[in-house]
A protein has these predicted regions:
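Phosphate/anion-contacting hairpin/loop surfaces
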Residues: 2-74, 78-227
């Protein structure tokens, strides 16, 4: 807390999203069960990945769209990695890609963190919305304020209907003693699977003309009503 009891301001965060214009630029061998069935919230125990291959007909960018693995993280170039390494992150793990000379220097950037335990559910006003082409309709704004309930709603409703979303109407509030500002790269988890980058990281990446990724400012860290 700052003097006078004013709450620390949360800095701007951006969602990192693969550029759709390039299509799938890399693929995983179907036989690699340990990779394809990885627990999203656990670190991998292997030090390299040899089952990812570059699609030679595609444009090579700093961040490559890998389709089936995109849920776990990002396939990034050495330049992208070296920039991110300068900033504090929450349970982000980089693993070397080997075997394909076209991917020399690339790493897979796993987002293993779960910050849903750090959210203050009574202060965070979660609502269930339907988002059809950015036209929001509130379906339920009287949700039981608990982590268990939010995860269940995400699993039973949102995961089976891509247009339904759980949204923190006035932005995330976090439990006392936890400061989200100390992390520049992270994922919330469960009902929010986006990959978040702070404004400082985004500026550093853009200064180096990083390609293959789009950054969209997230309203989930804003105190203003957005649904």
């Amino acid at each position: 807390m700052l003097a006078g009891g004013i709450k620390n301001k949360i800095m701007k965060y951006y969602k990192g999203i693969n550029d759709a214009e390039y299509g799938f630029q890399a693929q995983v061998d179907f036989g690699d069960e340990k990779l394809l069935k990885k627990d999203i919230y656990k670190e991998v125990e292997f030090s390299f990945i040899d089952s990812i291959n570059y699609v030679k007909t595609k444009v090579k960018t700093d961040v490559l769209d890998i389709g089936s693995l995109s849920f776990h993280g990002l396939l990034v170039s050495e330049k992208f990695y070296s920039i991110c390494e300068r900033f504090d992150s929450h349970q982000v793990q980089f693993v070397d890609i080997i075997g394909d000379e076209n991917l020399k220097g690339y790493k897979f950037m796993f987002f293993n963190g779960d910050l849903t335990t750090k959210i203050d559910y009574r202060k965070t006003n979660f609502i269930l919305c339907e988002n059809m082409l950015d036209e929001f309709e509130v379906l339920n704004e009287n949700l039981e304020p608990s982590r268990k309930n939010m995860i269940n709603i995400d699993k039973e409703i949102c995961s089976v209907d891509i247009f339904k979303q759980l949204i923190p109407k006035n932005g995330f509030s976090f439990i006392e003693g936890f400061d989200i500002n100390k992390y520049n790269i992270f994922r919330i988890g469960h009902f929010d699977e986006h990959f978040y980058f702070s404004e400082k990281v985004v500026k550093a990446l853009k200064a180096e003309n990083i390609t293959g990724i789009t950054f969209v400012e997230s309203v989930n860290f804003s105190p203003f009503t957005h649904c």
